[in-house]
């Protein structure tokens, strides 16, 4: 039995699962259990560093300027004009995605996902809306999916004004530029899981494109284990002129949007307000997005989104998919949702001249580190539970074994209830049950999978098993 130095009641006990299905899983010898590790951010692999170096701020700048040059990309704007309007922007994005797909040796497919949106808020008449969706199929776990998006529609001061110029450089050509650059650098590479690169429309009118995309995955019963939207990621300068060029915010909800009344009852009984799947996803991003390699600090914000605002991750949260939103550190509202104009010598409007393109490239590197690490590591464990059939000061955890072909085993992680990050981990081997000599009253536990390359997936927060 292992007993961490200087810490009572932390002996690790392991054993085979009790179920017949898990009886073939390897049992760990308690005497061989290692001391718990103190967790630290993971340095990127040589392969990941090479990927990050390929991200080019000049390409990102060219994308933002090209999208802004379509005049307006309002969802209700012209769809057939080849030079101006959302239709021209849609076709240009589609052409870029198809260009990148040609480097994928057939692994990337590109679809134009179009439908007629019925009349609703900010959509006065039936309107065709289109998402451009590129799917890079995984080689070993193709059914496990991670989505990254930006919205290519734009708006002026009046959300219904579909004729005035609305260049939408920061909101959200910057996010689309991130998605396109990610598609470009990842298309030639083989990933374990499937990655989806989506440029969605209808965001400014009511998150219509993201809702359609999320519902399409729900209808397919797709295993979407993570989604990131990049929305307003173009500037490092606040409205007072101060700059923060090396910080990106990542918004991650606590209590799940999709939580049922029964799940709420359990949460109130055992805790876990800070342990939603989206929070675990955000912790994973901070762990793998090394600032030395990305040039960026990820500031996780414990909110679903900015105060009283929303974004394209929310339709995914509503359908119980883990999701988060990347947004620049401080928004400048003179360059967001504004008519292009000059008032008292001050320029208003969301113009490319107010973007910081090396900053956007660093945002893309954070996304790339997260997506690559998610796709190459094992998925989030399923069925993680804490056994509560008997009162005891030890904690017994069970979970289901994953199907990844390179799965090496599992780690149990824990932290103090007041700590925002996981602080300790111990490798328990290729088992589906273990007992830790720590009270579940005093710490929070989690379980994560590890593959033979040593890559660790996101943590699963266990529910009680009665």
PLM regions and their residue ranges:
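Conserved aromatic anchor
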Residues: 393-405
């Amino acid at each position: 039995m292992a007993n961490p130095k200087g810490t009572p009641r932390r002996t690790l006990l392991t054993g085979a699962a009790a179920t017949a299905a898990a009886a073939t899983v390897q049992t760990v010898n308690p005497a061989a259990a290692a001391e718990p590790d103190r967790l630290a951010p993971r340095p990127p692999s040589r392969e990941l560093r090479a990927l990050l170096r390929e991200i080019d701020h000049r390409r990102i700048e060219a994308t933002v300027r090209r999208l802004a040059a379509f005049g307006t990309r309002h969802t209700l704007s012209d769809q057939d004009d080849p030079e101006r309007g959302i239709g021209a922007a849609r076709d240009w994005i589609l052409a870029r995605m198809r260009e990148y797909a040609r480097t994928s040796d057939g692994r990337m497919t590109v679809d134009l996902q179009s439908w007629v949106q019925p009349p609703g808020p900010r959509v006065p008449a039936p309107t065709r809306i289109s998402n451009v969706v590129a799917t890079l199929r995984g080689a070993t776990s193709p059914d496990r999916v991670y989505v990254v998006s930006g919205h290519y529609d734009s708006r002026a001061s009046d959300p219904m004004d579909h004729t005035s110029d609305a260049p939408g450089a920061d909101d959200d050509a910057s996010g689309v530029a991130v998605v396109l650059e990610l598609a470009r650098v990842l298309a030639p590479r083989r990933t374990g899981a499937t990655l989806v690169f989506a440029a969605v429309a209808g965001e400014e009118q009511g998150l219509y494109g993201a809702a359609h995309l999320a519902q399409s995955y729900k209808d397919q019963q797709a295993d979407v284990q993570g989604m990131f939207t990049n929305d307003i990621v173009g500037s490092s300068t606040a409205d007072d002129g101060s700059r923060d060029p090396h910080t990106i915010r990542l918004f991650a909800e606590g209590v799940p949007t999709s939580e049922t009344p029964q799940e709420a009852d359990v949460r109130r009984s055992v805790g876990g307000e800070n342990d939603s799947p989206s929070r675990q996803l955000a912790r994973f991003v901070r762990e793998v997005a090394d600032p030395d390699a990305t040039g960026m600090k990820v500031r996780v914000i414990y909110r679903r989104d900015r105060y009283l605002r929303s974004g394209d991750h929310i339709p995914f949260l509503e359908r119980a998919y883990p999701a988060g939103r990347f947004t620049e550190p401080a928004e400048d509202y003179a360059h967001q949702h504004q008519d292009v104009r000059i008032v008292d010598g001050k320029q208003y409007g969301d113009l490319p001249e107010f973007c910081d393109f090396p900053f956007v490239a660093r945002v893309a590197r954070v996304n790339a580190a997260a997506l690559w690490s998610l796709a190459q590591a094992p998925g989030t464990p399923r069925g993680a539970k804490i056994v509560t059939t008997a009162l005891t000061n030890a904690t017994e955890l069970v979970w289901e074994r994953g199907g990844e072909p390179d799965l090496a085993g599992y780690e149990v992680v824990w932290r103090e209830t007041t700590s925002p990050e996981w602080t300790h981990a111990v490798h328990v081997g290729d088992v589906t049950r273990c007992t830790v000599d720590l009270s579940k009253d005093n710490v929070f536990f989690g379980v994560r999978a590890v593959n033979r390359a040593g890559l660790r997936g996101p943590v699963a927060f266990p529910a009680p098993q009665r």
